[in-house]
Structure formats: structure tokens, C-alpha cells
Regions:
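Conserved donor-binding/catalytic core segment of Leloir-type glycosyltransferases
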Residues: 4, 152-166
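Acidic anion/phosphate-binding donor-loop and adjacent secondary structure
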Residues: 95-98, 136-151
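N-terminal subdomain of nucleotide-sugar transferases
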Residues: 1-40
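Hydrophobic anchor at the start of a short beta-strand
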Residues: 33, 83, 127-129
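Conserved donor-binding loops in enzymes that form glycosidic bonds
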Residues: 8-9, 88-90, 134, 161-166
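Donor nucleotide-sugar binding/catalytic pocket of nucleotide-sugar-dependent glycosyltransferases
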Residues: 107-118, 125-143
Length: 166
């Protein structure tokens, strides 16, 4: 089995991080993986040397393609035995889009969590689906980091949040 992974792993975004971790996890599991970037912005994000090595490999002989992007960007390709969609959504459904139509052309769909699976079912996606969480290299959490020294925050309550404002 040889897998072609197409995704935005060079974009410096959360999507890029997910694609990066997926590619490295496939490689660590012993899958013969080749990756190709899908550029969705003009940011040059950090890419590990291992990813660049996998990117330099030939895509000849790939029998599975994983498309890690938004469903309207996906396309079925009959040259592969399997066309896998790996996608994210933060909505309860996507009925009023072409996403289900595009997804239903593919062989199977992978989603990171139950809520995306539920949104897919609610939107009439009928291909076989699987929950494939975004992998995480836990070694980075065992590393010791120097605390940030921000003088004007000394002896003050500091509230951290990770969020998105749209």
C-alpha cells in the first residue's frame, strides 16, 4: 500500500498542523506515504525535514489518495483504489452546500470527531465514514520550557484563552 496525502501542511495554520501530524503518524505506522502540498494561502509555515523528505518521494504507484481539504475542493480520481476525504467542519450540517455531493463521489470519509460525523450524516453523506482523530506527538508536552518573563504582568492575574473571533 502506498498513500498519496494531499493537504495544506505548508500553510502555517491549524489545518497545516493537522495535516503535518497526520502525515508523520502515517509514516511512523509504517505506511509508505508521499505528500503533496495544497496551498490555501501565501504563508510559508514551518515544515519538518521528515515531511520534506516524504514530499520528495515519487508519487508513482500510489494506490490510495487522502485529500485533506474542504469538500468542495475534492475530486474523485479513478487511478486510485481508494479516494479518502479527510475534512473538518464546525457546523451542525452543510445541507446548503455542494459538500455532500462532492464527498459522496469518494470511496470513504474520515473526520476528526463525532460532531463532524453527525454533521455529515445530517447532510446526507452516504459513503462509509470513520472517526480518525488528529494525532498528537505527546513528546512535546514532556519538554521543559522556560517561563515567559513579562514584567508588567508580574503579580497580576493573567487569563489565557485560545479562541477565534469572527
Amino acid at each position: 500500500m502506498k498513500v498519496l496525502y494531499i493537504g495544506p501542511y505548508k500553510d502555517g495554520t491549524g489545518w497545516a498542523h493537522s495535516a503535518h501530524e497526520n502525515i508523520l503518524a502515517l509514516d511512523a505506522a509504517g505506511v509508505d506515504v508521499v505528500c503533496r502540498p495544497l496551498k490555501l494561502n501565501n504563508v510559508e509555515g514551518e515544515v519538518s525535514p521528515k515531511i520534506l523528505e516524504l514530499e520528495s518521494k515519487s508519487d508513482k504507484g500510489c494506490d490510495i489518495v487522502i485529500q485533506n481539504c474542504l469538500p468542495h475542493q475534492m475530486d474523485y480520481n479513478g487511478k486510485f483504489d481508494k479516494n479518502i476525504a479527510y475534512y473538518f467542519t464546525e457546523t451542525s450540517h452543510f445541507k446548503n452546500s455542494t459538500w455532500a455531493e462532492r464527498l459522496n463521489l469518494l470511496t470513504e470519509g474520515w473526520v476528526p470527531c463525532q460532531s463532524v460525523l453527525d454533521a455529515s450524516v445530517e447532510s446526507n453523506v452516504i459513503i462509509p465514514m470513520a472517526i480518525v482523530p488528529v494525532p498528537c506527538d505527546v513528546q512535546k508536552y514532556q519538554k521543559a520550557y522556560e517561563p515567559l518573563n513579562i514584567p508588567h504582568l508580574k503579580d497580576k492575574f493573567v487569563f489565557y484563552t485560545i479562541g477565534e473571533f469572527s
